[in-house]
Regions:
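Signature of the first transmembrane helix
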Residues: 12-73, 77, 241-261
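Transmembrane alpha-helix boundary and packing residues in multipass membrane permease domains
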Residues: 21, 25, 37, 74, ...
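Small-residue-rich hydrophobic transmembrane alpha-helices
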Residues: 48-108, 145-164, 258, 271-335, ...
Length: 447
């Protein structure tokens, strides 16, 4: 189950880890889209809207859980790299205890707050009942969502990115089958979508537990490993909390930009919504670089191979830049064709083409800043990742989108460029933070 990634070709290690991770992200994106696609076949606009709004709320919660779980991936990776198996076992046990106990509390709090949440997201009156039902079922299933994500984070900390890919594939297939059962055959509407989502993750968790029990690994868990240990919990949370806050803040910024677009009218609002979906697919590559650098970097830091960590960062940036440059150039020529499959309205196509021609450069810069974020997380400096993202959002991304919308009402191109400028600003902060971190490391070595 564990895979040592501290020797051999750096590029080969990156590809070995990142490709399954990329496929996992892709499957997870399909998983999220399945509910909307299937309910649209059997239900009306109100039910589709309910699932759309509810899934956005659940996406934000899931993203924050995944961010917090980054602390587990990094700390376990360091222990594996240092070949400290007792420490790895203690970190795995404490991860399970922390997240599962926390998920039960979170589920109870969310169920209690379901009505205010439905109001906050401005749910249309016709979709309130469906959204409320969808969210209650999903909130009750938060422990299942948490269990899947901590399983994935533990496996990745052990250097195994393939198993989580298989688990999400099982969840995706189960979700589609259950959606057709609950929404198609049983006509349960939004409740059926929520049940399909929750139960499919439960199936995936059960299968992952069976795999863990059957596989032989050098890491052996005992009851004592699940007993909360202050140092282990502190290590996990010190890395995970800044990432969780950062990811939550990013989701809020997307919501703000959506609100800005909504004020421009229906055509621009639709165009921005479509382009956001397209960009989310293209961002799978930069996102996989973040997770790859953090997991591989953590193992090599544990093994004391700091030069190899820098090489991992360089290769990841190179991969991100190459991919970003290819898609950025290509989209300039095929922008309308990229948008057209999502709408038959030619005005929306033209607006979307304008927006994506600017926004696509964010994909180029994101490959760099995401790689730096993974590097900082691997060194336990996730606060630096939170810092550059927060500064980017507050100083460039959101103000830039607002000003672009105000001064360029006839085109969405400047609004798209505002997002790219935000990532470019992040890179500048990352470079400064990187050199500061290297000086800190040299000072420690000299001492």
């Amino acid at each position: 189950m564990e895979k040592n990634l501290t020797s051999g070709s750096v590029l080969k290690s990156i590809l070995f880890f990142s490709l399954p991770y990329l496929l996992s992200y892709f499957l997870q994106t399909l998983y999220g889209m399945a509910d909307l696609f299937i309910i649209g076949q059997f239900e009306g606009v109100a039910s589709t809207t309910a699932v759309s709004i509810g899934s956005q709320v659940m996406h934000m919660i899931t993203v924050m859980i995944v961010g917090l779980a980054m602390g587990a991936t990094v700390t376990i990776g360091r222990a594996v790299g240092a070949e400290n198996k007792p420490r790895a076992a203690r970190l795995i046990g404490n991860t399970v205890t922390l997240f599962m106990a926390g998920s039960v509390v979170l589920a109870a709090v969310l169920v209690g707050l379901v009505d205010p949440i439905v109001r906050i997201v401005s749910t249309p009156e016709q979709a309130v009942a469906g959204t409320r039902t969808y969210l209650i079922i999903c909130f009750i299933g938060v422990p299942c969502i948490t269990a899947y994500n901590i399983m994935a984070s533990i496996f990745r900390g052990l250097g195994d990115s393939r198993s989580p890919m298989y688990f999400i594939a099982v969840a995706c297939a189960s979700n589609i089958a259950l959606d057709y059962l609950f929404m198609g055959a049983l006509h349960l509407g939004p409740a059926g979508a929520a049940l399909g989502t929750t139960l499919s993750l439960l199936v995936s968790v059960i299968i992952s537990l069976v795999v863990i029990l059957r596989r032989k690994s050098g890491i052996h868990l005992s009851g004592a490993d699940f007993k909360p240990e202050r140092s282990a919990l502190g290590e996990i949370l010190s890395i995970g909390i800044p990432v969780m806050m950062q990811d939550g803040f990013i989701q809020v910024s997307f919501m703000i930009i959506t609100i800005i677009a909504n004020h421009r009218g229906l055509t621009d609002a639709a165009a921005v919504g479509i382009v956001e979906k397209i960009i989310s697919f293209l961002f799978l590559v930069p996102s996989s670089m973040l997770s790859t650098v953090s997991a591989l970097g953590a193992q090599n830091i544990g093994a004391g191979k700091h030069d190899r960590v820098d090489a991992i960062l360089r290769y990841a940036i190179g991969i991100g830049l190459t991919f970003g440059l290819i898609v950025a150039v290509a989209v300039q020529f095929i922008a309308p064709s990229v948008v057209r499959p999502f709408t038959s309205d030619e005005a929306v196509v033209l607006a979307g083409a304008s927006y994506i021609r600017g926004y696509i450069f964010d994909c180029l810069f994101a490959g760099v800043q995401f790689s730096f974020s993974g590097y900082f997380c691997a060194y336990g400096k996730s606060g630096l990742s939170f810092l550059h993202n927060t500064l980017s959002i507050l100083l460039v991304r959101v103000p830039g989108a607002y000003l672009a919308s105000k001064f360029f009402p006839q085109t969405l191109l400047p609004m798209g460029l505002a997002s790219a400028c935000g990532s470019l600003f992040s890179i500048l902060v990352c470079v400064i933070a990187y050199h500061w971190l290297k000086r800190q490391q040299k000072a420690v070595l000299h001492d």
